[in-house]
């Protein structure tokens, strides 16, 4: 049968993988891991990665879901060489192949009504037989071609489908277990399993990496490929991802959408690093650069056991990348969160300056953005517990002394601010805590923050002194 490639298939490309999501919802972490494994295997073998949108479910597929999938792939920086291809734009190709299969006796029209099929199923169940089509229409000729019908693939009735799964090893399925699959519906639309076969053939896919829920589809697809005289890809069915309670990962475990992790403040580098370790590893190594993943990844080394999603581990990785990536790169991602939380970061220190300071305490960019407000916005409220502890009348004297000494500073440096704090404590004969804690609450409104010499340096001289004076006025009003 004639092969119609969508692009010039380079005969020197030994590996061509694909990611083929259905646009019926967001890109979830399971799909993202499948995409990552496919992408890594292609890159490891100097191959190509194809993106295909399997949108044959016309009722459930939406443009919004397609956009969300593409956004997720781009955010994860999983670039594709070919695509995205949409199955709904290839119906003519699928039907062309189906018509040729009918002509060659590889498929046949089935005119059976729903009632007949239901009666057949009921009869087989009564006789404790596995429900399957009885090929009643295979040799029928009295029906007009244009009468309502489906098209079925003529599946072999003898023999066994055998394939060596790259993850699970050898799998064998008897053809007696397989039915004559419907490959075209009554409305003329081709079915999912058939579209996948033609796409993998046309696109020269050599390795199919997908979830274990597709294992049952594989022998059916292999039989169609064999009937077409097409090469059979290597299949790799990866395990599901469970929550930390052992149950299938779902919304009740927290975020499951890739972009939801973005919204929660995770870096794409952290999520990629975490996902690659959910089923694959290299010794005891936990941190992998993208270059290391490409160099080391092998689909044959992926575990066939289910993996458990651990949010604490992801947070640990995220904090690592917040600290270790180039600060300008982290700042680019942080900008999105600052805008989302309504923080005008042009009115204060550069984001690159606050990231090293706050990332010691924050595990996500969302936390970091929220924690940074006092660098860019006036303090309107004070933490109540901190007020009760640190804004007593005796705090006025060290605050006033601080304001006086800080005002006199000509060089606003961390070292000079720290020296002012030490001098204030010495001159008033009090501990540094009696100076630092009221100072912190005055400048940040909080009971906790990075060290105050660094914090005040970033807040700026005028704002720092103004906030100290506001705090003194506040303490006076609380103790009238």
From Swiss-Prot:
It comes from the Bacteria. The keyword Cytoplasm applies. ATP binds at residue 251. A motif ('KMSKS' region) lies at residues 248-252. Its cofactor is Zn(2+). This is Glutamate--tRNA ligase. It is found in: Cytoplasm. SUPFAM superfamilies: An anticodon-binding domain of class I aminoacyl-tRNA synthetases, Nucleotidylyl transferase. PANTHER family: GLUTAMATE--TRNA LIGASE, GLUTAMATE--TRNA LIGASE, MITOCHONDRIAL-RELATED. A motif ('HIGH' region) lies at residues 21-31. PROSITE patterns: AA_TRNA_LIGASE_I. Keywords: Aminoacyl-tRNA synthetase, ATP-binding, Cytoplasm, Ligase, Metal-binding, Nucleotide-binding, Protein biosynthesis, Zinc. One of its GO terms (biological process) is glutamyl-tRNA aminoacylation. The gene is gltX. It catalyses: tRNA(Glu) + L-glutamate + ATP = L-glutamyl-tRNA(Glu) + AMP + diphosphate. InterPro entries: aa-tRNA-synth_I_cd-bd (IPR045462), aa-tRNA-synth_I_codon-bd_sub2 (IPR020751), aa-tRNA-synth_I_CS (IPR001412), aa_tRNA-synth_I_cd-bd_sf (IPR008925), Glu-tRNA-ligase_bac/mito (IPR004527), Glu/Gln-tRNA-synth (IPR000924), Glu/Gln-tRNA-synth_Ib_cat-dom (IPR020058), GluQ/Sye (IPR049940). Gene3D superfamilies: 1.10.10.350, HUPs. It comes from Histophilus somni (strain 129Pt). Belongs to the class-I aminoacyl-tRNA synthetase family. Glutamate--tRNA ligase type 1 subfamily. Zn(2+) binds at residues 110, 112, 137, 139. Binds 1 zinc ion per subunit.
